[in-house]
């Protein structure tokens, strides 16, 4: 889960990272009041989870509260790379002497953590990495050790900080690592990290991405979710503990196990080439549980997508046997009643497959078609979806 800048700022402050005053505002009037409360020069910053805000006109300096009102009026409702600005942060103006860069992230390729640091901040870090890679220090972080004082000192030395700044910057890096570790983040980035005219090191802008797999350890993270931006079907599925991702297609997919579901997406996409180029409408992994309740919840989410024209249920019976899956499907259709109004193609294999097929055959539901293989099921589901387009 990516955080808004104001959320990252608040999280930094909670962990002792030095930040400037910042207040989120949803209306121009709130923005004016925030500017009056902070006092002096402020910056009106669009709150969207995308870069390039400044170039798009989403960041403006306000010398007075009236200017903050004017700028926020123009920024609120603005579209920045497909993201609508619904709120702004009124931030205290900074006396910037130097701009730096720091981030720590999950390095999936090397199964490690990676710290990146540069004395040249304030610009697109991707551009710096390409044009002047020597200006960006990259230090591998052992997950078992993390960033301790010695590692923080190594990072600032590798980045080329002036001797008189190294202690202060290292102290901020240790606190940013505290954010990364204790909040179960996959990214903590500050660009720019600045030295003020008074010689203080301050995090002026921040990005934080949290690992949603660790949500069970962080009940307080729930309030950070952007309810406005979340896809309503994905939000509904999440509330029911379903692993669901909406896609842009017509064939709903239900499977057990991420690998099987991913394979099903590929097979359906391939079959769709012969049937009007229909595509998978979603990823939905019900895992090991295929009870009537889980099936009903899954079908309810999928059938709530108006783009879905057919559903392909592809299950390999293991711990959860095929007869239990079949009973779950029959029970789900009974529970959903008239809202289950799209054809279902069901392919079962594995533990107790014959009993599962018998249950579905005897149920004789008009919407259910049995398929012997995954290829056959994908082809039939694509055919039905194309016919209903």
Curated annotation (Swiss-Prot):
InterPro entries: ATP-grasp, ATP-grasp_succ-CoA_synth-type, ATP_grasp_subdomain_1, Succ-CoA_synthase_bsu_CS, SUCC_ACL_C, Succ_CoA_ligase-like_bsu, Succinyl-CoA_synth-like. GO terms for biological process: succinyl-CoA metabolic process; tricarboxylic acid cycle. Substrate binds at residues 256, 318-320. SUPFAM superfamilies: Glutathione synthetase ATP-binding domain-like (SSF56059), Succinyl-CoA synthetase domains (SSF52210). It catalyses: succinate + ATP + CoA = succinyl-CoA + ADP + phosphate; GTP + succinate + CoA = succinyl-CoA + GDP + phosphate. Succinyl-CoA synthetase functions in the citric acid cycle (TCA), coupling the hydrolysis of succinyl-CoA to the synthesis of either ATP or GTP and thus represents the only step of substrate-level phosphorylation in the TCA. The beta subunit provides nucleotide specificity of the enzyme and binds the substrate succinate, while the binding sites for coenzyme A and phosphate are found in the alpha subunit. GO terms for molecular function: ATP binding; magnesium ion binding; succinate-CoA ligase (ADP-forming) activity; succinate-CoA ligase (GDP-forming) activity. It comes from Paenarthrobacter aurescens (strain TC1). It comes from the Bacteria. This is Succinate--CoA ligase [ADP-forming] subunit beta.
